[in-house]
Amino acid sequence: MAKKWLNKVKWDDNGLVPVIVQEVGTNDVLMFAFMNRDALQKTAELGEAVFWSRSRKRLWHKGEESGHVQKVHEMRLDCDEDVVLLKVTQVDNIACHTGRHSCFFQKFEGDAESGDWQTVEPVLKDPSQIYTAKP
């Protein structure tokens, strides 16, 4: 039987919904990703973030390789029912594959003519130490 709460989500033509991940406590926006029905269902079951990887075409349990899982405290649906917000605790404080706290580590500084994107968050851990080849 279809779950009513999953049917309420307005999925796009590819069966996906955009997801914003926000840290509990700081309210920092950590990342943006997509979920399909299975990913949202798994997230609710596990209490940890599971996304749909568009490049790998498979479910992606956040932290499955790095250990940097996201413990979900709350799931919210926006007013148009087409965007999900996850409020999470980020394990080891690293959400980004670059080894940073947030994927939003570049800030626009300057004006429209001469401005540029500046890196404003440090690398907390070298990605080569996070993602190692599996035997």
Swiss-Prot record:
Catalyzes the hydrolysis of the adenine ring of phosphoribosyl-AMP. Coiled coil: none annotated. Its cofactor is Mg(2+); Zn(2+). Mg(2+) binds at D78, D80, D82. It catalyses: 1-(5-phospho-beta-D-ribosyl)-5'-AMP + H2O = 1-(5-phospho-beta-D-ribosyl)-5-[(5-phospho-beta-D-ribosylamino)methylideneamino]imidazole-4-carboxamide. It comes from the Bacteria. Belongs to the PRA-CH family. Homodimer. InterPro entries: PRA-CH, PRib_AMP_CycHydrolase_dom, PRib_AMP_CycHydrolase_sf. Pathway: Amino-acid biosynthesis; L-histidine biosynthesis; L-histidine from 5-phospho-alpha-D-ribose 1-diphosphate: step 3/9. GO terms for biological process: L-histidine biosynthetic process. Signal peptide: none annotated. HAMAP family: HisI. The keyword Transmembrane helix does not apply. It is found in: Cytoplasm. Keywords: Amino-acid biosynthesis, Cytoplasm, Histidine biosynthesis, Hydrolase, Magnesium, Metal-binding, Zinc. Binds 1 Mg(2+) ion per subunit. This is Phosphoribosyl-AMP cyclohydrolase. Its EC number is 3.5.4.19. Its main location: cytoplasm. One of its GO terms (molecular function) is phosphoribosyl-AMP cyclohydrolase activity. Zn(2+) binds at C79, C96, C103. GO terms for cellular component: cytoplasm.
